[in-house]
Structure formats: structure tokens, C-alpha cells
Amino acid sequence: MPKRTDIQSILIIGAGPIVIGQACEFDYSGAQACKALREEGFRVILVNSNPATIMTDPVMADATYIEPITWQAVEKIIEAERPDAVLPTMGGQTALNCALDLDKHGVLEKFGVEMIGANADAINMAEDRDLFDQAMKRIGLECPKAKVAHSMDEAWQIQSELGFPVIIRPSYTMGGSGGGVAYNKEEFEEICTRGFELSNNHELLIDESLLGWKEYEMEVVRDKNDNCIIVCAIENFDPMGVHTGDSITVAPAQTLTDKEYQNMRDASLAVLREIGVETGGSNVQFGVDPDTGRVVVIEMNPRVSRSSALASKATGFPIAKIAAKLAVGYTLDELSNDITGGRTPASFEPSIDYVVTKIPRFTFEKFPQANDRLTTQMKSVGEVMAIGRTFQESLQKALRGLETGNDGLDPKVTRFNDDGMAHIKGELQVAGAERIFYVADAMRAGLSVEELFRLTNIDRWFLVQLEDLVRTEAELAKRSLSELTPRELFALKRKGFSDARLAGLLGVAEKDFRRTRQAAGIRPVYKRVDTCAAEFATDTAYMYSSYEEECEAEVSDRPKIMVLGGGPNRIGQGIEFDYCCVHAALAMRDDGYETIMVNCNPETVSTDYDTSDRLYFEPVTLEDVLEIADKEKPAGVIVQFGGQTPLKLARELEAAGVPIIGTTPDAIDRAEDRERFQHMVDKLGLKQPANATARSXEEAFAKAEAIGYPXVVRPSYVLGGXAMEIVYDASELENYMTHAVKVSNDSPVLLDHFLNCAIEVDIDAVSDGHQVVIGGIMQHIEQAGVHSGDSACALPPYSLPAEVQDEMRDQVKRMAVELGVKGLMNVQLAWQDGEIYVIEVNPRASRTVPFVSKCVGTSLAQVAARCMAGISLAEQGFVEEIVPHFYSVKEAVFPFAKFPGVDPILSPEMKSTGEVMGSGDTFAEAFYKAQLGAGEAIPALEGERKAFLSVRDPDKQGVIDVARSLLGLGFTLCATRGTASALQQAGLPVDVVNKVYEGRPHXVDLLKNDXVAYIVNTTEGRQAINDSSVIRRTALARKVPYATTLAGANAVCLALEYGNAITVRRLQELHAGVSQ
């Protein structure tokens, strides 16, 4: 039966900011759903608080709301837009929870809105652990032995029945938030307490331990006529006990017998039928006991998920697009498969003739205090996917695509003495981010497959595959390049070995190895992802490399532009860069170029098969990019949009004759190299903070004294402020030097005088090489010293004098012309005591480009891509800066809740995973909405409220204004001695509270007794930061709002004065008033 005609308009709820457990895969699914439904003639209304998404581009929906995803804000949107239906299955857990809230508060009933894609009963049955357990019993399937607890007493009762270890999982959370494995009473108490706080219905499921069992996922799609297909069966390389988002996963499943697969297939279909998912995609997770073969259903997600994005990219079957069409009444047999050009219907189960491996990307280096062991709570921030003809090939491609400095199964332990072996065994028994490397090391040390299976519970089949790779490496290390025959070289490349790894094993330079390989005629061929194992022809150029005979690339002779993507998400390089790559591809396609995308991140829109004309799902490494460039012969390659990943390759690509368009690699180097940059700043007569470069510890101490403390120290060439710190004296610098010089890669350490209490500004600009147009000026809310990616910022600036802004515009334009920028450029400036200082210049895409584009209503990335391809700003009609008539605030979102031991203080090292945007007529309104969108607690506006203040000496004067504002808002004040004395001298009423080391009762006791509603706590110096970290960690755990900068505290006071009225505005209407 074709689509429904009784609904005309549909509200899609997005997933909000990127957080651990919920990343850009929901931008990919949401963007697909928007396209699919508009294709069918429906009016699409979208709400999503994340400006860095493609789905919030104003062209993707008829009405776009970048607003907080709370049921109260969405109610306002429903009231204004009157949709007929709401589709909550495209925005992850955020959208499901919001839809359930709308249902619970009677909003859907009040406005006559139908929930499509999944109904409230099905969502509740899948999400409510008790109901799900009962449902499985009804269809004769087993769940892990488990019971639901609503209180600590019930939890202890259940634990006594199940024993230890037990697995704890809260209801209605994603990414395993608040869950964990408890081996003893102390851990049990801690995990349950945290779990109860995070579950929105105060409910925990306590399971028997399935640690060491095999884990599988089935991606299933079902329509209303009960047609069901399995899109993909995914097997976890890591056994149960590691969250599936943190596991290495492989598709199709490798170690199931056909009978086991059919049983699991039947079971997953039965689960969907029982839960009542009638229209769309779901994923069902199974555990299998390797000893007895017992199968249990672990859980199911009645929505598009992280693994469905992976399954879509792995098979070419667009689950989100199909699910959206099923939600409006189509059946699978009525929909055709795009990849085969409609030659097959969507009811054909995909079959694949290759192996896909996904490996998660972790950023534990950002959180040294965090527990880096992998458990049932997800900790990875991104992932990489690779496709090969064999498991070995796809695994090795994925390992080099991770960009963690590994070219393959690189050794982590070099000496197999007692200490080395103890370290290896520890890493094998309790999984960390690099366990697979330690498995290889254990094999090098002589452990057998059987011993490794006992230590890790990783299936023997995978271990045998790894053993073969390790053995091959050991044999190779005894030989020289000159004695290898072409046949042997070909066999090595078929196993997925990278040129760099083979060169390392053979003791030659990578480029010499590559020359020898190519001279022997050993080159990759490109195969197509076609959903049907080459049974039908495919018109879609979605490709991966392999070492085989026949190439399916079918290269055209059209002029081509190649865009290099950013690889896996990580803190410091996320969805914002993918957004820029997508926009570059769209602009170039519109201008008549054939567009080629190279990337290996399965979550993103850039790796959707219809974003570009040709997609190469390949690691973004020199070897892989050179081979594609040689095959395609593009007219130009864009390396400036994907963050550091492609930029790192720029020089070598250029040297190999690859045509890089836009700002030259030399100009990029001029901006990034300290000494060359200094020359440029001096030449233009601009100012920089006093700075120096040190190549040894002694030199660092001498130069730090000369430029004066406090100083910011960092290694050269970093993104996201890796290993960047503020040091306040020589002992802190010494401490830093012992840790940081390791990451310096023989490159020096940079020292800058730190501009205390300066206002920091970010400016994005576009240049065509002659003319420069400012994209937007953003004023940071936190003072200098907080990484620009972590600071909230406002556009237009809310307190920066107009003449200062004009001078900044002038400086940016002069620098762009001097550097010969062609494309995007981002400049960070600071204003202190009437002087403007240049902090840094990046002649490339920055993470603020999507936010600025949403504010001004013009895609800066598209304008810049056209400049790079030789179309001037005048020809594009983009000749003057657009200053919006409304305020927008970008707020960062942090993963601290996933890492309970980490101090949530902001520093020059970037820690945020995502961002939200709030807009309003005033700065206060925009800031308030950004806080709501970020899920930040905002102090209550009524009742008895106490604010606790404890600030560093330089802030003692400034805190008086904050205290006055808080008193005016009805707060009572308490403060530590020094701060209290400053407030008392200003005549303000305040109670004195002990610092933690001054005796009880102290500040943390107050917090734990729920006696504090708001905290302002600023510190400087390593000792003071350590002393006060318990205050911030306790505030975070107890959801008490806090500010760690005075500027942040002032902004919160303004937001509180604004009140809590919720207004919603359509992005298209906002933009109508800002056109040039």
C-alpha cells in the first residue's frame, strides 16, 4: 500500500549535541529522513539543538528549529507548526525520551499529533527492562537472569541472589550511561548510586554476569505488512563486558554456523513482532555462551542506532531512508534499492562479498585521571570503518585509519621479561583501548591461541587470523626488500599490510618500498559496494580498495575535485569538519565538477553514497590517498576542510604532484610555524603576547623567566590543544616539561605569556586571494585560557566596543592578504587593557564555521570551496560581512559524566565533544537557551537558594558584582574566608564556610547536604586546582550548577534575570532578516 495521505506534515526530532554514545550517526540518519520525506511531498519540520549538523541546514527541512530538545520547547514548536505526526526514531535516545515526555505530558493528544515509526507502547516495552523481560518470556526467548531495582534495598536483595560479578544498567539511557560491572560491594554501591541518579525513572536492571560471552547484533527492518529483512549481522570481536560501541566489530558475522545464524535471525524477527515495531529499523543484541551455546537476548533498540549507521555504510543499504518511508505507510516491496539503480526492491536482503571492520577511537589522553578500562559504559568518541576482501585486510586498513600512530599491529611492548609479560597479561585480562595490540605482542612472546582465549575470551577464529599476521611479520623481518618476489609482495598487500608497516619491517623508507611495489606493477584495484555481492549492476560509485585482478572504478574523464575527509571523530576534530567537507562537495557538484570524497568514518554524512559523485571508503593516509589520486587524476584536491588529518598530508601530496587547491601548504606552514608567523606579525606591525621557543628544559626555564609567568606551554603543531597547560611558576613548568616533551616529536615546546582576564575573540573569514570578507565575529564568554572549542561564544559580540571590532576586522583582512589565503581562515585574538593581541591564525576550516553559517544564513564552506576552485567573491555576490539582528550563543557539551574521576575544570586543553546553539533577541535569552540545549543545570528561580563563592585572588574584586546580582535574584551567599572578606568589605551579607582542608563542616559537606543551589569557583595554579577539584566533581555528580570563570558566572546571572520564558524561532525566518 503506498504512502499515507491522511498526514501532510511531520516533525522530526534530532539527537542534539555530539556526546559519547550518540555521535554524528544521527545527523546522517536525520538528514536521510528529511530528504526521504520531502521527496515524498511531506512538509518536514525539524528540531535539533546542534548547529554543526547537515540536517539543520535551512534547505533540509521546510521549517528548521535550532532549539533545546526539551518537551517544553518542542511543545511550543508543535503549537506553532501543528504537525500531523512526529517521527522520534531518527534522533537516538534524546529523541525517544523527548517523544515519551511529550506523550506523558499530554502534548501529542492535546494537538492531535500521531507518533509514527514507533509508538509509545513499543518504545516503553523495549526500554523498560521489566516489560522487555516479560515480552521475551512470552515468545520463549531467554534474557540474562535479571531483576529490576527501584531502591538500594531492592538492589542489595537482587545482588544477594545473583552473586558477583553483576552487570548494572539504568533504564532510558544511552551509551550505557551510569552502568557498569561490579565485582565487589564497594563497586556495587557506587555504580548503583550513580545509575539511580542518571535513570530518568529511577530504575536499574541488575543482570547476571555474561562476561566472556560472544556478542552479536542483528540489524532488522520491518514494515506494517510484517515483511522483515536482516540488513546485516554484526559480530563483536571483544566479548561481552565491553560496551558494543567500544568493541571492535566485524560484519558479516564470522564465527556463526549457518544453523546458529538462522536461529538468531528467527529470534530477532520474533523480538520485533512482540515489541510491536511495525515500521522501521531496530537492532537486536544477542549473547552466546561459548561453552554451552546458550543464547540470550540482551536488548533491542526500537530506533535507528549507531550500529544501523554502521550497517548502512557496511552494506550500502540506507536504513534511515527506508525506515522513514516505512513510517509513512510504504512497504519494503514498494521501495526500490538506490544502489542497484532500482533493479532490486528494498525487500531484498543485502548480501556482501567483503568484510567490514569497525574500530572505536578513544581520547583518554584528554582525561588522564579517567579510568581507561573498557566496561559496559561507552567511552569511545569516534570510530573508523574499513572494507577489505578478508578480515585481515579490513582489520589492518582500519588500524591505520585510526590515526593513533599505528601502521598496523605495531608492537607496544618490546621486552618480554617478567615486567613486560605482567603488563601484557594485565592488558589482556581487563580490556583497554589497545587490547588488540597486546594480543599481537603476546603472540610475539610465544603465547598460544588457547592461552590467549583463556585470558581474553576472544573467539579462537579471530586469534588464529591475528596469529597468521604476526607470524608473517616475524618471517618478513628476517628478509630484505630486494629478495621479495612480486608474487610475495602481492600476497602481503592482500593481507592488508600498509606500505609503512612493511617498510618498517624490512628496514627501508616508506617511499622506497612504494617505488619498488609500484615498479613491480602491484597496485590496488577498486571494488564497488553494491548490496548484492555483484549479482546486479550498480550505478553508484561507492568503492573500497583491494589487491585483486579486476578493477570496477570505471573512471570518467570529467573535471574532478577530490575532498579529503577528517577520519574518525575525536575530541578536537569532530562533526564540524565533516560539515565543511560535505558543503565543499555539494558546492563543487553544483558547479559541474565530478566530486570525489575520501574518508573512513562510518557515522558521517560525508560517507553517504549520494553526498558526492564518487565515494572512496578508505583510510585517509598518504598511501591510500596517493593511489586514489593516481587512479582518478583530479583537477584539484581540497585538504583544508577535514581538520589536521588531511592537512598533515598536504606537503607530501604536493611533493608527489597532487594538485592541492586553495591556500598553499606553504602558507599554512607560515601560519603554523612559530618563527615564520612571528616574522609576518612583525612585518604587519601587529602584536602577539610575549613568546619564546625552547628546545630543552634548561632553555624553557630561562625563557619562561624572561617572558614572565603565568605562561601557556604547548608542543608545536597541535589540534584541540593537546598537552597545553597554563603554568604559574617554575615548579609547575618543571612538572609540565617532564610530561610534555614526550609528545613533542623532536619538535620544540612553545611558551607564551598568558593574558590573564583578557576577552578572547574568534573570527572566521573567507578570501579569494584578493578580497577578504569577514564571516562572523564571536566573543568568547570564558576569558582567555580556556580552549576556544570549550568556551561558549556569542555572535555578534555582546560587550566588545564597536571600534575594537573594526580594528580586529582590519587586522584579519591584512593577515589574510599577506598569507595569500584562498578559502577559509580562522583567527583568534585577545583584547586586554586596550590592546589587541594575535593569538593564532589557522588558514583552513575551523570548528566554528557551521555555527557562523547558521547565524548569518550563508554557507561559508561553500563560498570558500568556490574561491578555491577559482570563482571570486565578487562573482559569487558575497562581498560584505553579514551582521545578524539577533544574538546566537554556541555552548560546548562535555563528557565529564562518563568519567567520574575527572575534574570538570576548563583549561587550554580541549575536552568538549559537541556543541549546541541558542538564539534570541538579547544575549541573555540566547545564552539561557544554549544552557538548556546543552543540558546544563541552571539555578532555580524560586525557593530558598544559597550560592557558594570561592574565587582566586585576581577575581576578588570582580566577584563583588556577581554577588550583588545573585543577591538581587534572591540568593543568600556563603563563601570561603578570603572571598567572604572581600564581600564583607563591600558591605554584602555572607556566611563563612571552611575550605576542605580547613576542617568540617566544609564546602563539600554543604553540597552533599543539598544546601547549595549555585557555585562560583575560580582557581589558578596546580595545587589550588587540585585542592578544589573535589568541589567541582561533587557539583557535577549532584547536578549542582557551577561556573569556573567570572565571565561565565556573569552570563548565568544575566540568563537568570531574563527568566525562564521559552521562545522558539524558525531558522528560515531568522535568515530572512539577515540577507546581504
UniProtKB/Swiss-Prot annotation:
What residues bind Mn(2+) 4, as annotated? 840, 842
Q: In which pathway does it act?
A: Amino-acid biosynthesis; L-arginine biosynthesis; carbamoyl phosphate from bicarbonate: step 1/1; Pyrimidine metabolism; UMP biosynthesis via de novo pathway; (S)-dihydroorotate from bicarbonate: step 1/3
* Location of the region described as Oligomerization domain in the Swiss-Prot/TrEMBL record: 404-553
Give me the ranges of the annotated region Carbamoyl phosphate synthetic domain.
554-935
Question: At which positions is Mn(2+) 2 bound?
Answer: 299, 301
Instruction: Outline what the protein does.
Output: Large subunit of the glutamine-dependent carbamoyl phosphate synthetase (CPSase). CPSase catalyzes the formation of carbamoyl phosphate from the ammonia moiety of glutamine, carbonate, and phosphate donated by ATP, constituting the first step of 2 biosynthetic pathways, one leading to arginine and/or urea and the other to pyrimidine nucleotides.
Task: List keywords of the entry alphabetically.
Answer: Amino-acid biosynthesis, Arginine biosynthesis, ATP-binding, Ligase, Magnesium, Manganese, Metal-binding, Nucleotide-binding, Pyrimidine biosynthesis, Repeat
Catalytic reaction equation(s): hydrogencarbonate + L-glutamine + 2 ATP + H2O = carbamoyl phosphate + L-glutamate + 2 ADP + phosphate + 2 H(+)
Instruction: Give me the ranges of the annotated region Carboxyphosphate synthetic domain.
Output: 1-403
Q: Which GO terms describe its molecular function?
A: ATP binding; carbamoyl-phosphate synthase (ammonia) activity; carbamoyl-phosphate synthase (glutamine-hydrolyzing) activity; metal ion binding
Question: Gene encoding this polypeptide?
Answer: carB
Please list the cofactors this protein needs. Answer: Mg(2+); Mn(2+)
* Domain MGS-like, residue spans: 936-1076
In this chain, ATP 2 is annotated as bound at 714, 753, 755, 760, 785-788, 828, 840
Origin species, per record, is Halomonas eurihalina
InterPro entries in UniProt: ATP-grasp, CarbamoylP_synth_lsu, CarbamoylP_synth_lsu_oligo, CarbamoylP_synth_lsu_oligo_sf, CbamoylP_synth_lsu-like_ATP-bd, CbamoylP_synth_lsu_CPSase_dom, MGS-like_dom, MGS-like_dom_sf
Q: Which residues bind Mn(2+) 3?
A: 828, 840
The entry marks the following residues as binding ATP 1, namely: 129, 169, 175-176, 208, 210, 215, 241-243, 285, 299
Q: What is known of its domains?
A: The large subunit is composed of 2 ATP-grasp domains that are involved in binding the 2 ATP molecules needed for carbamoyl phosphate synthesis. The N-terminal ATP-grasp domain (referred to as the carboxyphosphate synthetic component) catalyzes the ATP-dependent phosphorylation of hydrogencarbonate to carboxyphosphate and the subsequent nucleophilic attack by ammonia to form a carbamate intermediate.
Q: Where does Mg(2+) 3 bind?
A: 828, 840
Where along the sequence do coiled-coil regions lie? none
Q: What is this protein called?
A: Carbamoyl phosphate synthase large chain
> Can you list the GO cellular component terms from the UniProt entry?
cytoplasm
Positions with a binding annotation for Mg(2+) 2:
299, 301
Q: How does it assemble?
A: Composed of two chains; the small (or glutamine) chain promotes the hydrolysis of glutamine to ammonia, which is used by the large (or ammonia) chain to synthesize carbamoyl phosphate. Tetramer of heterodimers (alpha,beta)4.
User: Region annotation Allosteric domain: residue ranges?
Assistant: 936-1076
ATP-grasp domain boundaries: 133-328, 678-869
